[in-house]
C-alpha cells in the first residue's frame, strides 16, 4: 500500500462567482425541457423525470431513490445546488420513481404484490430501452443503491459508473429480523423509516431536516405504498459480493456514507468486498444519514471528480471543499485510470494519484 497523502482544497475562488445568478441558472436548467414519462414494465408502471437532453457520446445520469421518499425528496437538494448546473449542462439526467412512490400515485389495494428489489432492478432495462439510453452513470441511495448494484451485476455493459450512497448489500439476518419485529410493536412505519434514513443523533436532536421528512412521510397519502417498498427493501437478498471472486462490480464505483450514519458499517463492509482498483470510498463528516441532502456541496464536488476520473468534464474547476477539511488518501494497487477525488502532482506534470478512501 502506498503512503498516505494529505490533500487540501481551497475555497478561495468559488466555482461560480455569483451565487445568486448560479442558483437562478440551476433552477432554470432544471425546468427547461423537464419531461415526465410513465413506462410500462413487467413489474408495474415506472415514472421517470428527464432533465436536459441526451448528449452525444455521454452516458445518462440515472437516479433511484430510497424508501420513504420519491425522487424529489431524495435528490432535489443535490440537483438544485448551484454548482450542479454544470453537470446538468453536460449530461441528461433521468430520475426513476419506484412504482407507486411518485407524487400523485394510485394507492395500491390491500394484498397488492409489490415487486422485490431484484424485480425493481429489472425495470431499469425497460427505462433505458424506452429512452434510448445506451449507457448510464447510476446514483442510488439506500434501496436505490442496492437496486443499481443488482442491475449492474446483470447488465454491466450498460453501466459506466456508480455512485452508491448508504448501500447495504447484505440480506437481513435473523437478529435483524427479530429486532424489526420487536420495534414494529412500538414504532410506527414512519418512525422505522426515519431510523433508516437518519442517524440517531439527528433524530434525537430533532433537526429541521428530520422534522421535515417525518411530517412528509407521516402525512403522505401514499404511506401504505411506502410501506410496500419498505417491505421489499427489508426482504432483499444478499448480493454476495466477493473481492477477487466472480460476483463484483466491474465499473468505477464511489461508495458514500455519512460518519455515524445508520448504514456506516454496511458501507465499510461493502468497500472491503469490492475491487479496490475500481472503488473509491467517501465518508462524510457532519452529514448525517443523507449526505446528498445535508451536504450537497461536498457531494457535488466529489461527483465532479468521479466523472472527471471517467474522462468527462476534464476542464471543470474544483474549488468548493474547504481547507479546513483534509482528505486522507490511500491506494491499494495500481489503477488503470485516474479515479475520483484524485490530486495531480504539485508540478502539474504527473498523473493524478489514485484514491481508495477519503474522509472529509
From Swiss-Prot:
Family label: Belongs to the NDRG family.
Name this polypeptide is given: Protein NDRG2
Location relative to the cell: Cytoplasm
Biological function: Contributes to the regulation of the Wnt signaling pathway. Down-regulates CTNNB1-mediated transcriptional activation of target genes. May be involved in neuron differentiation.
Keywords: Cytoplasm, Developmental protein, Differentiation, Neurogenesis, Wnt signaling pathway
Alphabetized InterPro entries for the sequence: AB_hydrolase_fold, NDRG
Gene: ndrg2
Pfam family, one: Ndr
One of the GO biological process terms: nervous system development
Any single GO CC term annotated in Swiss-Prot or TrEMBL for this entry: cytoplasm
Chief site of localization: cytoplasm
Annotated region (Disordered), positions in chain: 324-360
Protein source organism: Xenopus laevis
